[in-house]
Regions:
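Conserved short beta-strand edge segments in small beta-sheet-based binding/regulatory domains
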Residues: 64-78, 158-177
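Extracellular disulfide-stabilized recognition modules
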Residues: 83-84
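Canonical RRM/RBD RNA-binding surface and closely related RRM-like beta-sheet modules
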Residues: 1-41, 47-58, 66, 79, ...
């Protein structure tokens, strides 16, 4: 989906927060305002056609509209079509990570991710933090090249689940947009 007339300062969190309940998001990209445009635009790709159709139907309905940060945005089908992938599967843009709380916390993980790949953050939730264990839920802007890259980087850098590893488990979590 192609979304126009977004607030100039739109964030991934506010954009994706307005898409809740539509379906798993595969990728999101925000284009900030540029020469001749005062508003931002975004591309949102869903994992499956049904989610894209549900979102497009909602956004096209004059009685509902698609509102982000108080502005009515215009949603159109993207001219570049994407094939459905992982239909009915468990891949998402959300990771749930458990492990040593010295590593599994907001500051350490976001700093570490920043050294491995570029990412956009929707939400970071600390589910548990004790002296012995940290558990967090990281909602990236996209599965493609963000949540997927984070999972691979963690698996390649740490012996996940092995004795002595600071990362005990990494799994895909529920996408709040689904």
């Amino acid at each position: 989906m192609w979304i126009k007339h977004l607030p100039a300062n739109v964030t991934y969190s506010s954009l994706l927060g307005s898409i809740r309940g539509m379906g798993r998001v595969f990728a999101t990209h925000i284009n900030p305002p540029n020469e001749g445009h005062k508003t931002a635009a975004a591309k949102v790709v869903f994992f499956d056609l049904e989610a894209a159709q549900r979102f497009y139907s909602m956004a096209s309905n004059p009685s509902r509209r698609f509102i982000v940060q108080g502005m009515v945005a215009e949603v159109t089908r993207n001219r570049i079509r994407s094939a459905a992938c992982d239909v009915g599967g468990n891949l998402t843009r959300v990771l749930v990570i458990r492990g040593d709380p010295r590593i599994v916390n907001r500051d350490s993980l976001l700093r570490w991710f920043g050294t491995k790949f570029q990412f956009d953050l929707d939400e970071f939730t600390t589910m548990m933090h004790t002296e012995e264990m940290g558990e967090v839920r990281v909602a990236f802007g996209s599965y493609r090249s963000q949540a997927q890259a984070a999972q691979l980087a963690l698996i390649r850098s740490f012996p996940v689940g092995q004795p002595g590893s600071p990362i005990w488990s990494v799994r895909f979590g529920h996408d709040p947009c689904s």
